[in-house]
Amino acid sequence: MSKLTDVPKRILIGRALRSDRLGETLLPKRIALPVFASDPLSSVAYAPGEVLLVLSIAGVSAYHFSPWIAVAVVVLMFTVVASYRQNVHAYPSGGGDYEVATTNLGPKAGLTVASALLVDYVLTVAVSIASGIENLGSAIPFVVEHKVLCATVVIVLLTLMNLRGVKESGKLFAIPTYVFVGGVFVMILWGAFRGLVLGDTMRAPTADFHIRAEHQGLAGFALVFLLLRAFSSGCAALTGVEAISNGVPAFRKPKSKNAASTLAAMGLLAVTMFCGIIALAATTKVRMAENPATDLLHNGHPIGSGYVQNPVISQVAEAVFGKGSFLFVLLAAATALVLFLAANTAYNGFPLLGSILAQDRYLPRQLHTRGDRLAFSNGIVLLAGAAALLTVIYGADSTRLIQLYIVGVFVSFTLSQTGMVRHWNRHLAVEKDQAKRRHMMRSRAINTFGAFLTGLVLVVVLVTKFTHGAWVALLGMCIFFATMTAIRKHYDRVAEEIAAPEEPDDDLVRPSRVHSVVLISKIHRPTLRALAYAKLMRSDGLEALTVNVDPAETKALRDEWERRGIDVPLKVLDSPYREVTRPVIEYVKGLRKESPRDAVSVIIPEYVVGHWYEHLLHNQSALRLKGRLLFTPGVMVTSVPYQLASSEAAKMRARRRQEWSAPGAVRRGPAGERPKEPSEPSGSAGASGASGTSGSSEAPGSSGSSAKD
């Protein structure tokens, strides 16, 4: 790693951690709750408002249905929590819904679940941050005026926090999450005390407004459809529940028990806050409208485009605490902050799921590799990029983004619970112990009811939200599914192609002879080292090769070659069009054609430099040549490095990075146990791959040439 990128990376992300410190990043329950459950906990900041927005289509009279919708959401939440408690005990490895569906329903069902969850994680980041920006914008106008920019900045900051490691980010996120939860409970209790004990009349700032209903007097099927749509909007309170089942490996031992306890606590807190806010909204007469400028009426007139519609939780807090009071400001700040931090659920769930998918060869294997801070860095960056793109496309508008929401999570809910039913059926078929059978039958009953209820809700969500944006989420799921299927086919095809055969084939037969070719442009120390290394290989044939792009330089090279008496034949390739790469490629192919059973070893001298700008000052055409040679069967490419004096600076930087636990420290071992590097360049040649990334290479005959390949 270069000095230019190393120092900023260490400042932003921190020192690299050794693999044996992975246990130090595992989470206790008090930290796991805000890390994994911040999404469903924070959803009470916008889920009640989404319910009222849908009901407002039928006017204020439809608001009396909101408590019943809240009851339906509570029943659904408790059902899902009870179902997932069975999941974390049966599958503690962290695969969550993906592992359950794959094991019990097959690979296609598993991929469907994975696609749904990946889309939902991206939407979690986009929705949470967009909603947080809008809440913050009610106090700071600049934020609303630059929503997309501010949302993107928050995504970048969250990404950096998570790249430092889940435990550190969890500690930071715990404080505002607990302040938010505590503030909401204080608001609910104080509001209940004022209303029930003191008899105070609490009124929201919109209590005197009227709503211009789009459809008056809805009844029959139209009313049922409206209520179902409002219920599906309220189901946003359930998003993120599955993150705990995906993140079981991140918990401290006993992992399953701690995850199940955290899941139960999350469900209880979320439904209590959701119901409390719905009840206070009804008590304080909160009014919401999808188009407030035209649908909210004050004294019989539209309120106008200058009106900013505050979220339900903000209006309730103003009615309970009083506008501008300390508790009002504290809750408003905590609400905005916790909405930003709710995205952290996805920052933990997405990389973990991506790692499992990569291990199963459905995603690039780089997603399975942990970064310097023992986090799945590639998955974190991928999630951030996708969420930022979605935020820009939708203008950081939470109302539009929420229409895409929750489709994926209910797909995973339904398939996961269906898979758990099959899981218990399989175990009941072989289990003889009556106590264990009773426990399994109870778990099966819970998962059966969960599968039925979540499947029913999925149908409701698809029917009521398809034209409002759910089709975009479905399209994203299809794209993920097709991409992962193609990646798996590619990995399977490559594995089959490179598998070691039982019988010897041409690739395994020892070559009859090895013909070595040393590429040179002039006689200097790197050339002499490459020739010495080639002689050590004891090849059956050895020659030096140069390309004649400048007759004067070629003649000078021949003369010095003869004067020095170098005992290696010099082959000169003519190049009328001053090309370097093509003549060499054609010559090497000719050697292979003459003797197909022979192997050709192409040896290239290489400069090792210490500064990035030195790469620009040396001829790079040999690097292109090496890249072309990789596609020539039977040709081996070897780089012989020669360390220039400036490479000592790079060695000094490497020694300093050892004290910083630089990247690669995990593979090299503790800094104190690593062997000292020699202060002088090694006299022996080293071989490297054809990529030539360790330095600059000189192409044969290219010195001083401006010709293009």
What spans do the regions from the language model cover?
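C-terminal membrane-solvent junction of multi-pass transporters and transport-like membrane proteins
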Residues: 366-378, 413-458, 463-466, 497, ...
